[in-house]
Amino acid sequence: MASTSTLLLPSLSSKNLHIAVPIRTNSFVRRTTKFSTKCSSNPESKDQFINLTPAPESINTTSAEKFPIEKRRRSEIIRDRTQRGIEKPEPPNFEIGWKRTKEINLEKPKGYVIMDFLEKFEALMAREFGSKELLAKAGEIVAERAREEAEVLRDEGKVEERMVTELFRVLKLMEMDLAMVKASVKDETLSQRIEQARARCRQAILVANSF
């Protein structure tokens, strides 16, 4: 056996034998995924962001003092606190029943004091009175007071002389009718004289109203 192995060695060495030994290699392949974003050149997307973003010059350019905010005055605030009652608002149409469209003259006439005396005395004659003498005396006092007031208005130049003279004439006629009331005996005559005196008193009221 040893001789045969020694014989084979030179023969093997003399021949060029190429023996391919398979080599087992473990190769690991790494798979990588690449993500790519494609930028489009569409101008509409840019315009959307431009519209949403405010301009730099429009930010913080108006001061707090110049900002257009209407401020309420202090007097108006106080006035709102006091008005807590229920008030009827003004109607849209002013030509309605409870609101007058014609202006009412509230100025009193010049002879309103004389008118007041005579109106009260005329109402007194329409009632039941104590006696005829007291009614005639009250008429004399009222007529004298009306004359004094008319003379004051005449001296101040507010009433003309002819109006004062007319008032004095009517008052004198009223005093004459009251004297007839005091002298009357029958009830029929008494009622007639009283009605005549009341008519003279109403006439004196109209004269005083025309001052």
UniProtKB/Swiss-Prot annotation:
Keywords for this protein: Chloroplast, Coiled coil, Plastid, Transit peptide
Location of the protein in the cell: Plastid, Chloroplast; Plastid, Chloroplast stroma
The keyword Plastid is assigned to this record: yes
Annotated organelle transit peptide span: 1-38
Gene Ontology BP, a term: NADH dehydrogenase complex (plastoquinone) assembly
InterPro entries, alphabetized: Chloroplast_NDH_Assembly
Main location: plastid
Disruption phenotype: Specifically defective in the accumulation of subcomplex A, a stroma-protruding arm of the chloroplast NADH dehydrogenase-like complex (NDH).
Coiled coil: 136-163
GO cellular component, one term: chloroplast stroma
Task of the protein: Required for both formation and activity of the chloroplast NAD(P)H dehydrogenase (NDH) complex of the photosynthetic electron transport chain. Functions in assembly or stabilization of the NDH complex; probably involved, together with NdhO and NdhH, in the formation of an NDH subcomplex A assembly intermediate (NAI500).
PANTHER family on file: OS01G0676200 PROTEIN, PROTEIN CHLORORESPIRATORY REDUCTION 41, CHLOROPLASTIC
Subunit structure comment from the entry: Biogenesis factor component of the plastidial NDH subcomplex A.
Protein name per its UniProtKB record: Protein CHLORORESPIRATORY REDUCTION 41, chloroplastic
